[in-house]
Amino acid sequence: MRHRVKKKHFDRTKEQRLALYRSLARALIFDERIETTVERAKALRSFIEPLVELAKEGTLHARRQALSRLPDKPAIKKLFEDIAPRFEGRNGGYVRIIKLPYRRRGDGAEMAIIEWVE
């Protein structure tokens, strides 16, 4: 039973949702700032923050765990070597979501920018 279980499904199967999260995470890691819908940004935040926690550990085991969640070696390498050292003194809140004053033209979806906190 699914009583009181809340998760955004985005009208996708589990595999499609995971592919969406991985694609958004990859884009955020390489571009460091992306524009997407508010709901996708919130879902991405809950996907990417545990990856940053693993990257801060920096161990081989943590790297392998991160690769199992985001199977993209260049992205994991950048996450562990470039992004994680920025957050050594921070205990969470690695990304910032900024709501944009306009909506998407096609369907009126509320848009946001998600970026790393510096």
Swiss-Prot record:
InterPro entries to which the protein is assigned, alphabetical: Ribosomal_bL17 (IPR000456), Ribosomal_bL17_CS (IPR047859), Ribosomal_bL17_sf (IPR036373)
Entry keyword Repeat: no
Keyword set includes Ribosomal protein: yes
Any Gene Ontology CC annotation: cytosolic large ribosomal subunit
Source taxon at top rank: Bacteria
TM spans (from-to): none
GO BP annotation list: translation
Keywords for this protein: Ribonucleoprotein, Ribosomal protein
A molecular function GO annotation: structural constituent of ribosome
Similarity comment: family membership: Belongs to the bacterial ribosomal protein bL17 family.
Subunit structure: Part of the 50S ribosomal subunit. Contacts protein L32.
Protein name: Large ribosomal subunit protein bL17
Organism: Aquifex aeolicus (strain VF5)
Gene: rplQ
